[in-house]
């Protein structure tokens, strides 16, 4: 463990996680938004549970739907630990119709959906490299303390997410 603090980019050869660890973890900044259900959300809304986050700019296209489906299946695969995990879509919805919003809510029940009207400070936490967070198509994992700690690329297999989460939920007393 000491080596990780001294050399944060180093990973042992036997590292078995499928996602990319975010080192150091990034705490989510304070935020205040309203989800599609009209409920106020802030940073405490994401505390106490592991949260799979997907950021989308504009209409939810085929890849967006596939990612949301994968996230839902990953959560369902957690069995008895399903209640320790939640899903969040942060959606820059410039011009997206109410019908599209309603369709997303219908197809992905229980999915927290938060529309953005501007580049919120929350989104900047997800900026990991030269790719803009709203167009990177990644799935991000936020821990129950409100820290961004891992991400998955668009072509990563959901089975890897399932295995990582099974391990995290098994060995973590959080969430």
Range-by-range predicted roles:
Residues 1-5:
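Hydrophobic membrane-insertion alpha-helices, especially the h-region
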Residues 8-44:
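N-terminal "domain-start" segment that seeds a small globular fold
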Residues 10, 68-89:
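Conserved helix-turn-beta segment immediately C-terminal to the redox Cys motif
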Residues 43-71:
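Short active-site neighborhood of thiol/selenol oxidoreductases, capturing the structured segment around
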Residues 54, 87-89, 141:
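Structural beta-sheet core signal
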Residues 56-58, 90-94:
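Structural motif
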Residues 86-88, 95, 99-137:
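Short, internal strand/loop/helix patches
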Residues 135-175:
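Thiol-/selenol-based redox modules, centered on thioredoxin-like
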